[in-house]
C-alpha cells in the first residue's frame, strides 16, 4: 500500500495516544495546558518514533487552532516568514487559539533561521512547537529556548509497543482483513528499539511478505525478514558521550554484563576503537 502503516493508524486524539503518560496522562504537564486552553510554545525532545509529530498534530486538533507544519530539512527563512504572515492574518490571532507552527527537526535550523522565529513567538503571532532528537540546550538558541517549555519524550515501553501491535492488527483497514496471529513478539519488540514507527514498519514488512490471508508471526520469521537491526547511535552527538560514560561507569562498578552491553552498542554503531581505547586508559 502507498500509505505506510504508521501513517494509516496515526492517533487523532489524546485518548488514542499510547505513550508519554507523564506528559499527557492525568495531571501531565501538557494535558494540564490543553485542559486550560493555554498552550505555551514547546520543544519536544526525544528519540525517533516517540510521537513528537503526532503529539503536535493532536494538540492543534484538540485545541482547535490553525496548524502550520515545516520541516527544517527543506525550509528556509522565506518559508518561515510566509507562514508567519499567514498566521498574522488568522481570525484567531491575539486569542487563546493563536496559530501553531510546528517545526520538525528544529535542531537543523541555523542561528539565523531560529532568529527569524523570535519576534513571532514574542508577539504571540504563533505558538511554536519544535521537535528534535538532539539536546535543545545545545541546538536551540538561548533566546528561543527561553520562550519555550522543553518536554522529554521517552522511547515506547514494552507495554506500549505490545498495545500498538494489537491496535495495528485490529484497527488497520488492511491488516484487520487478514488473520494475523502474534505467536511470538520478542524479536519484533527488540528490533524496534522502542521506536513505534520502526515497530509498525517491521510489522507491515512481515505481513506483506507473506502471500497468505493467515499470518502467524514468530521470532524466526521476523529475524529472517529483517535480518539485521540498525543500532541507534550518534558518533558526534550527545549520545556519543553518554554511552562511553555508561561504559566506563559499568567497569568502575564491576558490572561486566553492562560493560559488555555498552561496548557492543558502540562497536555496532561504528564507534572509533581508538576512542574507546583512549577512554579505557584515562
Language model regions located:
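C-terminal helical "lid" of AAA+/P-loop NTPase domains
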Residues: 186-191, 197-211, 221-227, 245-249, ...
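Pre-Walker A (pre-P-loop) alpha-helix and adjacent loop at the N terminus of AAA/AAA+ ATPase modules
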Residues: 2-47, 86-89, 259-263
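Walker A/P-loop
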Residues: 2-3, 32-71, 85-88, 118-123
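Conserved AAA+ ATPase "SRH/arginine-finger" region at the nucleotide-binding site
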Residues: 71-74, 149-162
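Conserved P-loop NTPase/AAA+ ATPase motor core
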Residues: 230-282
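Short glycine-rich substrate-engagement loop in P-loop NTPases that contacts/grips substrate
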Residues: 23-28, 67-100, 111
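Conserved catalytic/switch belt of AAA+ P-loop NTPases
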Residues: 31-34, 103, 107-146
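Helix-loop-helix "sensor" segment of P-loop NTPases
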Residues: 165-185
Amino acid at each position: 500500500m502507498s500509505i505506510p502503516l504508521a501513517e494509516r493508524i496515526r492517533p487523532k486524539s489524546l485518548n488514542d495516544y499510547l505513550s508519554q503518560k507523564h506528559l499527557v496522562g492525568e495531571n501531565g504537564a501538557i494535558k494540564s495546558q490543553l485542559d486550560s486552553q493555554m498552550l505555551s510554545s514547546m520543544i519536544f525532545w526525544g528519540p525517533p518514533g516517540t510521537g513528537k509529530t503526532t503529539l503536535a498534530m493532536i494538540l492543534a486538533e484538540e485545541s482547535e487552532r490553525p496548524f502550520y507544519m515545516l520541516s527544517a530539512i527543506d525550509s528556509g527563512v522565506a518559508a518561515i516568514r510566509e507562514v508567519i504572515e499567514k498566521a498574522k492574518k488568522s481570525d484567531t490571532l491575539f486569542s487563546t487559539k493563536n496559530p501553531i507552527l510546528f517545526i520538525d527537526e528544529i535542531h537543523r535550523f541555523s542561528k539565523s533561521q531560529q532568529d527569524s522565529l523570535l519576534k513571532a513567538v514574542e508577539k504571540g503571532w504563533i505558538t511554536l512547537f519544535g521537535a528534535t532528537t538532539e539536546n535543545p540546550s545545545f541546538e536551540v538558541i538561548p533566546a528561543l529556548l527561553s520562550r519555550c517549555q522543553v518536554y522529554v519524550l521517552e522511547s515506547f515501553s514494552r507495554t506500549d509497543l505490545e498495545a500498538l501491535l494489537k491496535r495495528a492488527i485490529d484497527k488497520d483497514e488492511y491488516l484487520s482483513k487478514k488473520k494475523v496471529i502474534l505467536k511470538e513478539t520478542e524479536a519484533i519488540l527488540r528490533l524496534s528499539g522502542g521506536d513505534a514507527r520502526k515497530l509498525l514498519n517491521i510489522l507491515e514488512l512481515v505481513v506483506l511478505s507473506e502471500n497468505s490471508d493467515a499470518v502467524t508471526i514468530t521470532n524466526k520469521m521476523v529475524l529472517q525478514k529483517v535480518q539485521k537491526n540498525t543500532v541507534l547511535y550518534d558518533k558526534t552527538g550527545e549520545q556519543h558521550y553518554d554511552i562511553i560514560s555508561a561504559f566506563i561507569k559499568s567497569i568502575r562498578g564491576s558490572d561486566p554484563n553492562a560493560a559488555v552491553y555498552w561496548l557492543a552498542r558502540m562497536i555496532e554503531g561504528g564507534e572509533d576503537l581508538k576512542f574507546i581505547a583512549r577512554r579505557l586508559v584515562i
